[in-house]
Structures are given as C-alpha cells and as structure tokens.
C-alpha cells in the first residue's frame, strides 16, 4: 500500500510540474581582439549566435573549430554570429591562434566571467542561441566534432556538407 501511495505521489508531482521552457541565454559584455567592448544581448539578436568557449592549449577545441568554421561559412556572416570566447588561457595568444588557424570568428578575450555565467567549466563548451534568445543546442561533453557540425546545420536549416 505504501509503495502504491508513493507511486501516486510521484506521478502527481510529475504531472503537476509545468513544461520546462528552453534555457534563455544570458547577456554579457566582453573585450574583443582589439580591446573593443562586445555587448551580447540575447533578447535583441538579429541572427542566431554560437558561443564557443575555448582555449589556445585545448586539443579538443582545435579539432572542433574547423567544423564550426564550415558551419559559419555555409551560413554566411549575415546569417550567423560566432563568438570564440577564450577562457582558462593565461599564457596563450588567442588572436594569433585564430589567425594561424584561418578562423574568422569574433574573438572575446578573457572570457572566464562569461564562462561562469553559463556554467562552463571545461573546454570546448558550445551553445547555439536563436533570435529569441533561447539556447537551442548545447554541445554535450564528448560529442565528436562531426556530430556537432551536423547538429548545428540541422538547427540552422543548413544543408549537409558534401
């Protein structure tokens, strides 16, 4: 009888819980490659945005970033923003690293406070934010770069890469 009552209580709690809305992106300010202020306001986006939390020393970031560049190139700069938020990177030179890798993302330097806002503790972290400010994709730890590219293309309505 007690188990039956417990099951009923759990079921009632589950049914009474409202549907969970998608996570909302959090506004932030950061410094760009030349020290300019970058003001990310998710409720006022004109196009979707990818937030990539990375570090120059991170081999997983290095593996993921070319796939993200393919997505960025396919979407076009007028249809997608990509912010490469450098964090946990005291000794690296993110400007030189992006240049060397031929990656054209918007660099955000010293992004540790932004990573903390999003609960990112390791690299790479990746979020796709739609024009309503909803986080519609999060890279799950361990997702292969190819899988991330496919997911982003799907969410952005882009064709698969040939």
Residue spans for each PLM region:
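Positively charged n-region of N-terminal signal peptides that target proteins for export
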Residues: 1-5
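Sec/Tat signal peptide C-region and signal peptidase I cleavage site
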Residues: 17-21
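Conserved segment of the thioredoxin-like fold in thiol-based oxidoreductases
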Residues: 24-25, 63-66, 73-111, 123
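A short beta-strand-turn-helix
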Residues: 27-49
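Hydrophobic beta-strand anchors of alpha/beta hydrolase catalytic cores
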Residues: 50-51, 82, 126
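Conserved redox-active cysteine motifs that mediate thiol-disulfide chemistry
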Residues: 53-70
